[in-house]
Amino acid sequence: MISHLSHQNTKASTGHLLALFTILIWGTTFVSTKVLLIEITPVEILFFRFLIGYLVLLLIYPRSLRIASFREEWLFIGAGICGVTLYFLIENVALVYTTASNVGVIVSIAPFFTAVLAHFFLDGEKLTHRFIIGFGIALSGIILIALNGSFILQLNPLGDLLAFIAPAVWAIYSVLMRKIGELRYHTIGATRKVFFYGLIFMLPALFLFEFNWDLGRFTNLANLSNILYLGLGASALCFVTWNRAVNLLGAIKTSVYIYLVPVITVVSSALILQERITWVIILGAFLTLLGSYISERKR
């Protein structure tokens, strides 16, 4: 009994560390993306980062993943479409039609969508009152960070609607990855397969959006280092660690760490881009951390 509890605690601790590590990286991707956007379009960044991620995972785990049934194959297809193609494309298109603040706040409700879907479609994952209270507190903090003292409400129906769809799509991805995790496939191999389908379904978008195959832009050290950071770190490494965390903690507990992304983004922007941190941002960060703590606490 004691040995079983110790094993469970070790699994939980590992899951929390992996989720925190992932979010620390993902929270800084905004800075890299901002640098790349000077010369490279959003869809180009998206394609190249996941292509690099896929090739790295293929190099690390070249073995073919033998899927037991076509039903299981559909789980990988769905995860690739939702977690790689649709989520990032919808988020980028939303930014064209609405403000970055609106998108930042709306996308941060992903843990709530994930909790609702997990409650209905995953065994042993239930939506609790504590989670809802924590969600409300964290969301208020995220709103403060996004607005940063400029309390001007700007509604852009199309862009805001797309921004709402993005976290719903991420929630579907989280649930699908939890189901894939239950099948006991190798985490790196499973993530690589998800990337493969994500890239396949991304191809039509290359014709719909402006896409330039010119690789000469990556001879620029800033462009090269940042696309490698996104491809190696934020994609290849972090999707593996995130998917492993989902397997260990469950979709709901892991998703709570998404609340921390705006906080990490603000801190990294201040350190690297010299952007100013105000008392409103500090209060927002405190509320976000408090909300995530309440959501994670056991009864």
What role is predicted for each listed range?
Residues 57, 77, 117, 129-149, ...:
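Hydrophobic transmembrane alpha-helices of multi-pass small-molecule transport proteins
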Residues 2-44, 81, 153-179, 201:
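Glycine-/small-residue-enriched transmembrane alpha-helix faces in small-molecule transporters
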Residues 31, 57, 114-116, 121, ...:
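Transmembrane alpha-helical segments that form core, pore/gating elements
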Residues 2-8, 12, 17, 48-51, ...:
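C-terminal-most transmembrane helix of multi-pass membrane proteins
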Residues 46-48, 103-109, 176-200, 231-271:
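Helix-helix packing/entry segments at the starts of transmembrane helices
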Residues 25, 29-30, 58-107, 117, ...:
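Specific transmembrane alpha-helical segments of multi-pass solute transporters/efflux pumps
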Residues 56-66, 110-133, 263-282:
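C-terminal transmembrane-helix exit sites in multi-pass transporters
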Residues 11-15, 39-43, 47, 68-74, ...:
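Juxtamembrane helix-entry segments on the extracytoplasmic side of multipass membrane proteins
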